[in-house]
Amino acid sequence: MATSDHSLLGYALLGLIRLRQPCSGYDLRRFFAGGPMATFSDSPGSIYPALKRLERSGMVSCTLDETARVRRRALYRLSSKGKNSLRRWLAKPIKADDVLRRMPELFLRFSFLEDCLGPGACKSFLESLVLSLQAHITMLQDHLQSNQAKMSRSARLALRSGIMGYESQAAWARMALDEYRKSNAN
């Protein structure tokens, strides 16, 4: 993808098209509106321009469904270029600041990971996520320990809330990793 097309919406569309192809823009909009990806805008002003950018960049192909009753529907399929781009994005290593700045992206990547790259990739991803989260939690706890005497009560409580949120995500990642490890053992 060109730099301007490296948006989470673009990758979400690539992942969904891969799983549901062929699908129309309307099908994708409905999925965004009523499902777990509701954080993305389901407006035609977001989805259709993003689909056009993906088509222009060769990530998806579009054909017209002549069998539609009322009007022809554009049906999207992932191209080999789109599959490769999606795979590269999914396989990116987790960087230290990803847990601080890009948790929604990490969870979006994880949601497509098994279908695209298999359970082994999920296990590796979760192992890396646990390590990254634990490093970040340790850094925050050290900061709290070193600075709590200088911090206001509200600042300490806000920081503790952040730590607890990361601890919750780390606990989830360990639970998910255990599930993958158990499935490998069977």
What residues fall within each predicted segment?
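Residue-level signal for short amphipathic helical patches enriched in basic/charged
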Residues: 20-23, 35, 42, 113, ...
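Basic helix-turn-helix/winged-helix DNA-binding cores
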Residues: 1-99
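Short, flexible helix-adjacent loops and helix caps
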Residues: 37, 65, 91, 115-118, ...
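Mid-protein regulatory/catalytic core that forms ligand/cofactor-binding pockets
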Residues: 120-186
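Structural motif
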Residues: 4, 98-102, 149-153
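Amphipathic alpha-helical dimerization/coiled-coil segments
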Residues: 88-131, 135
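Positions in alpha-helical segments
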Residues: 11-15, 108, 124, 157
